[in-house]
């Protein structure tokens, strides 16, 4: 009798995706982050669902409903902090996942890569709207500043901003619609993840060498299920250390003050995972130029396959490309730091230099270095 997991219509899909899936035998721990992102998404949906049971999307009661969750709901404080810090874990895994794709040349799997970029934008939109919901000072002013950026669009900008606000300022209508979108988007993300995996399983995974691995495949279970489980334990350890020892480490103290349209906080800044893009936005004096640079800072990932000039897919045997990759990583850390600093000397000029370097590295320097390495292969 044939095994039920290979015959049952539903279990057959699960089997071909997670059990009998042929996987390269040499994929390293950098390949763990896909499954960790899946775990983060599950954690966020579950904790978010419980938070939504007690939260009220109304300007008069939103802030107090979050306080009520933390003080009066059984284990409400831990659910709230797992959700808030879970978002940080989500983005940490996302950035490493994208970085892994760049380093090992996974962007050559263009369908998977492009769906991944759409996923990145969707997750960023979800996180932004989620940050508005507690209706603290930084929630309100963050929503005001970021939505206002759309007014830079010629001709239709102002109308578009008022349409998103549902009025002439960020108010009850804005909060209600942001809650609705924040609730529905994770399910759209889940659907996109399935498409992401569908395209990945069409081609099979890349591996650290960047070579074809058809001649040397192993079943996903038990090898990579156990490996992913170990990665998950490390993720949960890090998350719970953050939640139980310093839950407000990555948050902003201003968000413990209820939203007040009459008082502007001294430094309006988003959560840490948006700071690099925020620094690029601020480094350009022109509003429309800043918005375009902000969008391009992520959208630039889509043209990576076109910028590939190397004969080797992975950076493993390309030391100069490795140096450029880690320079880019350091540049992103610099941009993240600058995004959290006030707009004054010397932070402005550092931000501008780091922004120019960011685009230069991806568009000019890295493809040029790859060409030089190609010529070095002939020597």
UniProtKB/Swiss-Prot annotation:
Function, as annotated: Component of the ubiquinol-cytochrome c reductase complex (complex III or cytochrome b-c1 complex) that is part of the mitochondrial respiratory chain. The b-c1 complex mediates electron transfer from ubiquinol to cytochrome c. Contributes to the generation of a proton gradient across the mitochondrial membrane that is then used for ATP synthesis.
Localization per Swiss-Prot or TrEMBL: Mitochondrion inner membrane
GO MF term list: metal ion binding; ubiquinol-cytochrome-c reductase activity
GO cellular component: mitochondrial inner membrane; respiratory chain complex III
Gene of this entry: MT-CYB
Family named by the database record: Belongs to the cytochrome b family.
Protein name (record): Cytochrome b
Cofactor stoichiometry and binding remark: Binds 2 heme b groups non-covalently.
Any one biological process term the GO annotation gives: mitochondrial electron transport, ubiquinol to cytochrome c
Organism: Mirza zaza
